[in-house]
Amino acid sequence: MSVSQVTDASFKQEVINNNLPVLVDFWAPWCGPCRMVSPVVDEIAEEYESSIKVVKINTDDNPTIAAEYGIRSIPTLMIFKAGERVDTVIGAVPKSTLASTLNKYIS
Protein backbone atom coordinates (compact mmCIF):
# COMPACT_ATOMS: atom_id res chain seq x y z
CA MET A 1 0.00 0.00 0.00
CA SER A 2 1.44 3.32 -0.96
CA VAL A 3 1.37 6.43 1.16
CA SER A 4 -1.58 8.68 0.37
CA GLN A 5 -1.56 12.46 0.49
CA VAL A 6 -4.47 13.90 2.44
CA THR A 7 -5.80 17.42 2.72
CA ASP A 8 -7.88 19.43 5.16
CA ALA A 9 -10.90 18.37 3.09
CA SER A 10 -10.11 14.64 2.95
CA PHE A 11 -8.65 14.17 6.45
CA LYS A 12 -11.90 13.12 8.11
CA GLN A 13 -12.72 10.54 5.44
CA GLU A 14 -9.20 9.14 5.12
CA VAL A 15 -8.15 9.20 8.78
CA ILE A 16 -11.00 9.66 11.23
CA ASN A 17 -13.48 7.40 9.44
CA ASN A 18 -10.95 4.65 8.69
CA ASN A 19 -11.35 1.20 10.23
CA LEU A 20 -7.60 0.58 10.28
CA PRO A 21 -5.13 2.37 12.53
CA VAL A 22 -3.74 5.33 10.57
CA LEU A 23 -0.24 6.79 10.74
CA VAL A 24 -0.31 10.46 9.76
CA ASP A 25 2.92 12.20 8.78
CA PHE A 26 2.62 15.98 9.20
CA TRP A 27 5.36 17.48 7.01
CA ALA A 28 6.39 20.38 4.77
CA PRO A 29 8.59 20.46 1.65
CA TRP A 30 11.15 22.85 3.18
CA CYS A 31 11.67 20.69 6.29
CA GLY A 32 15.00 18.81 6.28
CA PRO A 33 14.08 16.33 9.03
CA CYS A 34 10.80 15.65 7.19
CA ARG A 35 12.79 14.59 4.14
CA MET A 36 14.93 12.36 6.38
CA VAL A 37 11.94 10.56 7.90
CA SER A 38 10.00 10.24 4.64
CA PRO A 39 11.77 7.03 3.46
CA VAL A 40 11.16 5.50 6.90
CA VAL A 41 7.45 6.31 6.63
CA ASP A 42 7.41 4.76 3.14
CA GLU A 43 9.07 1.58 4.46
CA ILE A 44 6.57 1.37 7.32
CA ALA A 45 3.73 1.73 4.80
CA GLU A 46 5.06 -1.23 2.83
CA GLU A 47 5.83 -3.46 5.79
CA TYR A 48 2.54 -2.81 7.59
CA GLU A 49 0.32 -2.56 4.52
CA SER A 50 -2.21 -5.10 5.75
CA SER A 51 -2.37 -3.64 9.27
CA ILE A 52 -2.37 0.14 8.94
CA LYS A 53 -3.01 3.00 6.55
CA VAL A 54 -0.27 5.59 6.13
CA VAL A 55 -0.97 9.14 4.98
CA LYS A 56 0.97 12.38 4.71
CA ILE A 57 -0.38 15.89 5.09
CA ASN A 58 1.53 18.97 3.97
CA THR A 59 1.12 21.46 6.82
CA ASP A 60 1.83 24.45 4.58
CA ASP A 61 -1.01 23.56 2.22
CA ASN A 62 -3.35 22.27 4.94
CA PRO A 63 -3.05 24.54 7.97
CA THR A 64 -6.50 23.81 9.39
CA ILE A 65 -5.83 20.20 10.36
CA ALA A 66 -2.31 21.07 11.53
CA ALA A 67 -3.73 23.75 13.83
CA GLU A 68 -6.54 21.49 15.02
CA TYR A 69 -4.01 18.93 16.23
CA GLY A 70 -1.60 21.51 17.64
CA ILE A 71 1.25 20.80 15.26
CA ARG A 72 4.07 23.10 16.35
CA SER A 73 7.07 21.26 14.97
CA ILE A 74 7.51 18.91 12.06
CA PRO A 75 7.85 16.15 11.30
CA THR A 76 5.11 15.06 13.66
CA LEU A 77 3.76 11.55 13.27
CA MET A 78 0.40 10.78 14.82
CA ILE A 79 -1.35 7.47 15.16
CA PHE A 80 -5.13 7.39 15.00
CA LYS A 81 -7.25 4.39 15.93
CA ALA A 82 -11.04 4.30 15.73
CA GLY A 83 -11.04 7.99 14.86
CA GLU A 84 -9.06 9.05 17.93
CA ARG A 85 -5.46 10.19 18.21
CA VAL A 86 -3.74 7.56 20.34
CA ASP A 87 -0.07 8.49 20.05
CA THR A 88 2.32 11.13 18.76
CA VAL A 89 5.96 10.94 17.74
CA ILE A 90 7.74 14.24 17.15
CA GLY A 91 10.90 14.55 15.10
CA ALA A 92 12.86 12.34 12.74
CA VAL A 93 12.98 9.08 14.67
CA PRO A 94 14.59 5.77 13.75
CA LYS A 95 12.42 3.18 12.07
CA SER A 96 12.67 0.92 15.13
CA THR A 97 11.16 3.62 17.34
CA LEU A 98 8.28 4.21 14.97
CA ALA A 99 7.68 0.48 14.52
CA SER A 100 7.59 -0.21 18.26
CA THR A 101 5.15 2.67 18.75
CA LEU A 102 2.90 1.36 15.96
CA ASN A 103 2.98 -2.19 17.26
CA LYS A 104 1.14 -1.08 20.41
CA TYR A 105 -1.94 -0.24 18.32
CA ILE A 106 -2.09 -3.10 15.86
CA SER A 107 -4.44 -5.83 16.96
From Swiss-Prot:
Keyword annotations: Chloroplast, Disulfide bond, Electron transport, Plastid, Redox-active center, Transport
PROSITE patterns per the UniProt record, alphabetical: THIOREDOXIN_1, THIOREDOXIN_2
Disulfide bond sites: 31-34
Predominant localisation class: plastid
Active-site annotation: 31 (nucleophile), 34 (nucleophile)
SUPFAM superfamilies (UniProt xref): Thioredoxin-like
CC per GO annotation: chloroplast
CDD domains per record: TRX_family
Thioredoxin domain segment(s): 2-107
Pfam families: Thioredoxin (PF00085)
GO molecular function: protein-disulfide reductase activity
Site, as annotated: Contributes to redox potential value: 32-33
Residues of the site described as Deprotonates C-terminal active site Cys: 25
Classification via InterPro entries: Thioredoxin, Thioredoxin-like_sf, Thioredoxin_CS, Thioredoxin_domain
Subcellular location: Plastid, Chloroplast
Protein family membership: Belongs to the thioredoxin family.
Role summary: Participates in various redox reactions through the reversible oxidation of its active center dithiol to a disulfide and catalyzes dithiol-disulfide exchange reactions.
Name the record gives this protein: Thioredoxin
Source species of the chain: Pyropia yezoensis
